[in-house]
C-alpha cells in the first residue's frame, strides 16, 4: 500500500506511522538511522542567476489599487463561463456551483484518516458505492474504478487494461493504437506511456474521422490493432455521425474502442458510450460533474470498462 503525505506532515507523524507498521508486522522498529532534512535546498544549478521581474509592468503600478485595476482590465478581455457558453472543443465545461462545491470543505468528507477502520467509514463507503453504480449506469459500462487521480491517469489506466487483456490472451502483436487528429491532445501521450505505437487517422473537411483513411489503416495492420482512442464529440465539437460504424470496424479486427471523456458532458442523459460501441472510457468529474477545477487536488478521473475488460 501507499501513504500520501502533505506539507502538514512532520517527523513525529512519519515515525508514528513507521512504528505502527512495525508493530503490525511484529518487527522491532529501528528509527535511529532515519534522517529528515529540516529544509529543502535547491541545487545551485537550479538557482536563477539573471534578474527577475524586470518588465515595465512591475514598475508602472506603484499602488495595490492601480495593480488591482490593471489585473481586472486584463480579466475583462477573457471570455469565460461568467460571460456565456464557452465554445471550447477540447473540454466541454460548465459552471460548478458553490452549493455543489461547498461539501468538499466539510471535515467529515475531507479529513478522514487514511487508516480509519471500515466500521468508521460506512458513510464514505456508501458515497463511493453509490457513485460507482450511477457512473456505470450513465456510461453503460459494467465496472468503474476510482483509483485514477485525473483524467489523464484514467486514460492511462484504461489503455493498460486493454494492453493487459491482450497480454493475457497471448496476442502480443496488438500494439497499434489509432488516434484521430480530432482526439483530445493527451491521448497520444497516454497511448505511448501504455506501450502502444500511435497511428494518426485523418479527418475530413467537416471535422469527422476520415472513415476511408481509418479503413485503410485497419486493413493494413489488422491483427496488430489494439485500440482506437477517440473523443466524442470530437475536439472540433463534432458528433461523429458514423460512430457505430467506426466502433464496429475496430471490433471486427479484435480491437477495443477507448473514449476520452473530456466532452462527456455533451452527451450525458442523451446517449451512453457503452450502447454505441465503446469498451472503456474515463470521466472528468470536474467537467462532467462538480468536483473542484484544480485547487491542489487530488482530483478524480474514474475509468469505466465493459464486462470483457473488467477484473
Protein language model regions, located:
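Short glycine-rich or small-residue beta-strand-to-loop segments that form or flank ligand, phosphate
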Residues: 2-6, 52-54, 145, 229
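A glycine-rich phosphate-binding loop feature that marks nucleotide/adenosyl-phosphate handling sites
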Residues: 2-4, 34-42, 84-95, 148-154, ...
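Short helix/loop capping segments that flank catalytic or ligand/cofactor-binding pockets
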Residues: 4, 11-14, 61-63, 94-96, ...
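Flexible inter-domain linker/hinge segments
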Residues: 8-87, 91-99, 104-110
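Structural signal for hydrophobic packing residues in well-ordered secondary-structure cores
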Residues: 9-11, 18-29, 57, 61, ...
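Conserved N-terminal alpha-helix of the aminotransferase class I/II PLP-enzyme fold
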Residues: 43, 63-64, 108-149, 154
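Short acidic (Asp/Glu) and glycine-rich catalytic loops that position anionic groups and cofactors
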Residues: 43-51, 79-80, 106-114, 136-140, ...
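Conserved PLP-enzyme active-site core in the AAT-like
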Residues: 122-123, 153-311
Amino acid at each position: 500500500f501507499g501513504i500520501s503525505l502533505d506539507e502538514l506532515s512532520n517527523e513525529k507523524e512519519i515515525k508514528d506511522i513507521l512504528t505502527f507498521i512495525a508493530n503490525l508486522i511484529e518487527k522491532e522498529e529501528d528509527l535511529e538511522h532515519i534522517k529528515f532534512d529540516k529544509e529543502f535546498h535547491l541545487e545551485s544549478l537550479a538557482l536563477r542567476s539573471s534578474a527577475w521581474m524586470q518588465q515595465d509592468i512591475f514598475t508602472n503600478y506603484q499602488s495595490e489599487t492601480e495593480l488591482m485595476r490593471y489585473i481586472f482590465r486584463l480579466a475583462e478581455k477573457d471570455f469565460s463561463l461568467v460571460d456565456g457558453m464557452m465554445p471550447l472543443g477540447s473540454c466541454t465545461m460548465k459552471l460548478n456551483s458553490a452549493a455543489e462545491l461547498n461539501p468538499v470543505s466539510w471535515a467529515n468528507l475531507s479529513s478522514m484518516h487514511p487508516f480509519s477502520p471500515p466500521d468508521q467509514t460506512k458513510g464514505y463507503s456508501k458515497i463511493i458505492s453509490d457513485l460507482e453504480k450511477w457512473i456505470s449506469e450513465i456510461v453503460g459500462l459494467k465496472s468503474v474504478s476510482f483509483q485514477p487521480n485525473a483524467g489523464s491517469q484514467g486514460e492511462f489506466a484504461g489503455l493498460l487494461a486493454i494492453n493487459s487483456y491482450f497480454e493475457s490472451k497471448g496476442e502480443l502483436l496488438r500494439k497499434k493504437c489509432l488516434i484521430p487528429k480530432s482526439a483530445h491532445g493527451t491521448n497520444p501521450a497516454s497511448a505511448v506511456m501504455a506501450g502502444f505505437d500511435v497511428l494518426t487517422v485523418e479527418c475530413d473537411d467537416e471535422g469527422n474521422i476520415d472513415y476511408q483513411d481509418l479503413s485503410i489503416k485497419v486493413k493494413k495492420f489488422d491483427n496488430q490493432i489494439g485500440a482506437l482512442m477517440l473523443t466524442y464529440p470530437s475536439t472540433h465539437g463534432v458528433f461523429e455521425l458514423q460512430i457505430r460504424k467506426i466502433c464496429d470496424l475496430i471490433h471486427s479486427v479484435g480491437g477495443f474502442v477507448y473514449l476520452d471523456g473530456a466532452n462527456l458532458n455533451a452527451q450525458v442523459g442523451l446517449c451512453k458510450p457503452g450502447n454505441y460501441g465503446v469498451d472503456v472510457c474515463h470521466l472528468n468529474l470536474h467537467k462532467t460533474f462538480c468536483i473542484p477545477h484544480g485547487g491542489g487536488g487530488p482530483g478524480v478521473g474514474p475509468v469505466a470498462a465493459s464486462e470483457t475488460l473488467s477484473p
